[in-house]
Amino acid sequence: MSQLKIGSSQCLWTSICIVLFVLSMARGAVSRNYGDALTKSLLYFEAQRSGKLPSNQRVTWRGDSALRDGSDAHVDLTGGYYDAGDNMKFGFPLAFFTTMLAWSNIEMATQLKAHQEQENALAALKWATDFLIKAHPEPNVLYGQVGDGNSDHECWMRPEDMTTPRPSFRIDAQHPGSDLAGETAAAMAAASIAFAPSDEAYAQILIGHAKELFEFAKAYPGIYQNSITNAGGFYASSGYEDELLWAAAWLHRATNDQIYLDYLTQASGTGGPRTAFSWDDKFVGAQVLVAKLALEGKVESNGKIAEYKSMAEQFICNCAQKGSNNVKKTPGGLLYFLPWNNLQYTTAATFVLSAYSKYLTDAKASIQCPNGALQASDLLDLARSQVDYILGSNPQNMSYMVGVGTNYPKKPHHRAASIVSITKDKTPVTCSEGFDAWFNNPAPNPNVLMGAVVGGPNDNDVYGDERTDYQHAEPAPATAAPFVGVLAAVA
């Protein structure tokens, strides 16, 4: 009897050891998957490049394109990134994802370096900032769009074949756009911090542009789509107060100049409680940056500063399901904000969680939510759960990042990826031929858009993988940029 007990005990312990070993191996596999996803997330930006591609271009199915952008205005507007799955360059979302790429480079510099991706991450950022510098040729002039959104969307063409009009649109003193100028100022200021350790001269150039753009945004108030009306149907801004706070917060972090902190504390409001962080709504970002100052003890956490911090933490509490207005979750556990490209909001919110986890750790602080406390580790655990969902731990067992695992979207809504590469067939694909032969083709895309994150599933965790479903199948840099930082944080 005792021998039986001993044998059973040994069997039990053997079973436990096997289970623990399997779990540890699975955990290691996930960890390695984060690193793989991080590498691929940066490859995606190379697939989005416009202009003359560099000799070290790794996404070789793409070719040079849009080499005359800006010629109608006698300005060089080549380079930069295409928007989502089309061939447009929309300055407003472009500037936002540039800011988020910069923030990823800043907060997760150590992790990016450890995974040997810092050089690639900075290269992705510089491809954007080089373009933004060219788009700002005078203190009160900023080019905010290249291409006509309507004609572009009426065609399905490779960027290398484009025959659609490429008009250049700008804002200036007579045609203002405080939101566009403010967001671009934020991008330049944030990028200056990212580049300062390796290229101080370039960082100073960026700071100069950021300061000019911030003054331009303040001096000539206005919503940019009233000046660039073509943008209104695609990326309409809901206001410019958030961009001005966001820009001031980044300029203060980059320069430590009191005037930018004064702007933040003397503003009429802090944005109040927000339900999302996105290319249109930067209040959460500004709130988080000011909260960081308070956590570091660089400013007194009272008055307006305390309000910024409270609003930032209220957003985090709601994401963590411990607030008074919690973010909806799908049955599978995904933070769900809006039906159209929900993952852009999820990755942005998850970046906030990752960054704030770092701030709390450094400050040895926690958050007191209406329904319980949150430690730094809780925030990172929630961020990791969202990453895991996006990379395949979901009811469909599908990775929503292209190229990760074997079950991932094969037909993302993306012109360049869905048409045979120009390196394989140089025969031009016309506007209508693209729709007939490629857009409506039920086959998978001929080019794998490695690292792209699609719009994601609906609120019931269902994803159909149809090229025609642009609300769920279209990837965008605004989704990918914050995800770079999140992946680095959890890798």
Curated annotation (Swiss-Prot):
Its main location: secreted. The active site is at residues 86, 413, 465, 474. Keywords: Carbohydrate metabolism, Cell wall biogenesis/degradation, Cellulose degradation, Glycoprotein, Glycosidase, Hydrolase, Polysaccharide degradation, Secreted, Signal. One of its GO terms (cellular component) is extracellular region. Residues 1-31 form the signal peptide. Gene3D superfamilies: 1.50.10.10. It is found in: Secreted. It catalyses: Endohydrolysis of (1->4)-beta-D-glucosidic linkages in cellulose, lichenin and cereal beta-D-glucans. Glycans are attached at residue 397. It holds the Pfam family Glyco_hydro_9. One of its GO terms (biological process) is cell wall organization. Its EC number is 3.2.1.4. Disulfide bonds: none annotated. One of its GO terms (molecular function) is cellulase activity. It is an enzyme of class 3 (hydrolase). It comes from the Eukaryota. Belongs to the glycosyl hydrolase 9 (cellulase E) family. PANTHER family: ENDO-1,4-BETA-GLUCANASE (PTHR22298). This is Endoglucanase 14. It comes from Arabidopsis thaliana (Mouse-ear cress). The lineage of its organism: Eukaryota, Viridiplantae, Streptophyta, Embryophyta, Tracheophyta.
